[in-house]
Structure formats: C-alpha cells, structure tokens
Amino acid sequence: VFQDSISAVNPRKTVREILREPMRHLLSLKKSEQLARASEMLKAVDLDDSVLDKRPPQLSGGQLQRVCLARALAVEPKLLILDEAVSNLDLVLQAGVIRLLKKLQQQFGTACLFITHDLRLVERFCQRVMVMDNGQIVETQVVGEKLTFSSDAGRVLQNAVLPAFPVRRRTTEKV
C-alpha cells in the first residue's frame, strides 16, 4: 500500500474493477466470488458497497486509501507492505487508519512492514522498529513506552518529532 493512493490506481476504473484486478490474476475465483470478496473487503475497511461504482476522483483521500488497503487484503497476503501509507492523510484520518490496520491485523493475521519517518506512528502501531541509514539497518529495537536510539540516524529521527504541544519560550522585551 503506497503513500500516494491516487497514483496507485487507474482513475478511469471503478472501485469494483480496482478490487477485482488482483483477484483475477492471483486467485482462482469465479467472477461472482470475486464480487462477493470485494464487498467483504470493503466492509473490512469500513466502507460499504455504495463505493463500488465510483471512480477514484469521486472518493476522499481516506476512502481511496482504504480502497487500496482492501485491494491489498483481497488476495490474503501473509505480509502487507505499507510504504508511508498514512503520510498524506490528516492526523484524524491517520489515527483512524492505524486503528483499522490493528483491527485488520487481528482479523486476517497479516504481518505488516510499516515504512515511515514518523516515530509517533511507530509507537502507536509497531512492535519492533528498524532504523536504516543509506540502505543499511543500523539499529533494531522492540517498541516500548519511549523510543530512544543510540545510532546517529535514529537520533536524527527522534529529534525530528514535533512535540505534542508547542513549546512556549519566554521572551524579555525592552521598551
């Protein structure tokens, strides 16, 4: 599942066609079974059949990202790769998609490789974190209450996290 859901789908196809495409190529299902599976996957990502005949430009960013999740899950993968999959969403939608991913992990037993630069998302979703620098893994740790890194690359990520609330600075003004 990619960061840019708009580029990940053909804008001229309907959601029904988008969901059926991987099933046609990767599963031995009849058309009626594919359609039933498409409907089931939409329900799993909190969408209903009313979106089946819509095209991507008619959907919100959050809806389209959930369609992409449904498409990926339709073929029952053992591993789901999420490449910055919530980066283009606002914080409310990010939180909703993270909750949805946790639910889907439990429901389908699918492992997730969650690629992100946002450590707040790592803390909310992941059990283990690996830090990469120039294509090499430089640090691995279990995600606990507070992530602290020893590698330079890990500390750069850690220092890039914005505080939950703005920090007020005291200023002294001479009049």
Q: What are these model-predicted stretches?
A:
Residues 147-175:
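C-terminal boundary and immediately downstream tail of ABC-type ATPase nucleotide-binding domains
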Residues 69:
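Hydrophobic anchor residue at the start of the ABC signature
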Residues 33-50, 158-159:
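Conserved ABC ATPase "signature" region
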Residues 55-59, 63:
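Conserved ABC ATPase signature
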Residues 122-124:
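A short, surface-exposed alpha-helical micro-motif characterized by mixed small hydrophobic
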Residues 76:
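Conserved catalytic motifs of ABC-family nucleotide-binding domains
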